[in-house]
């Protein structure tokens, strides 16, 4: 059986602000807007469908994105240019740093809605042979 993720709804205080944050930071594009949703497409066809909801109803989630070394460099440069607080670890004990887990690089930061974001260049456990 083949099962693929098609889309996920990402709650935001402002769907446009959150969608544009991802578009700008990761070089993605808005592919559609309908109803309460602004969809941002990832390379594998999955969309992040941003929906505005009241801030007190947002439950922070964690989203991890596997990116190339070049994409990491570009995104990390933007994180630095914008003064976005970032950490090498999910518990925020190593501020202003990145990690080198599994032979790659990774960084954690928050999006405008308070979701914990992670960029990694190597999947957890490393690449399979």
Where are the regions a protein language model picked out?
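Amphipathic alpha-helical segments
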Residues: 16-29
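Short, flexible helix/strand-to-coil boundary loops that buttress conserved ligand/catalytic motifs
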Residues: 22, 76, 121
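Short, solvent-exposed beta-strand edge segments and adjacent coil->beta transition regions
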Residues: 5-7, 45, 60-62, 104
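Structured loop/turn residues at beta-strand edges in well-structured enzyme cores
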Residues: 1-3, 58, 112
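Vicinal oxygen chelate
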Residues: 65-112, 116, 124-127
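Conserved short beta-strand elements that form part of the metal-binding/catalytic scaffold
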Residues: 29-61, 67-69, 110, 117-121
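Short secondary-structure junctions
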Residues: 27-33, 84-87
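N-terminal beta-strand motif that seeds the catalytic metal site of vicinal oxygen chelate
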Residues: 1-16, 63, 123-129
């Amino acid at each position: 059986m083949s099962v693929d993720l098609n889309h996920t709804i990402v709650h935001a205080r402002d769907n446009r602000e959150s969608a544009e944050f991802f578009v700008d930071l990761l070089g993605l594009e808005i592919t559609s807007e309908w109803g309460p949703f602004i969809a941002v497409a990832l390379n594998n066809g999955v969309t992040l469908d941003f929906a505005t909801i009241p801030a007190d109803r947002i439950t922070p989630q964690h989203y991890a994105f596997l990116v190339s070394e070049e994409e990491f460099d570009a995104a990390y440069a933007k994180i630095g240019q914008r003064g976005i607080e970032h950490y090498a670890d999910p518990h925020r004990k190593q501020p202003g740093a990145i990690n080198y887990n599994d032979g790659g690089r990774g960084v954690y930061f928050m999006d405008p809605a308070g979701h914990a974001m992670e960029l990694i260049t190597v999947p957890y456990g490393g690449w399979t042979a």
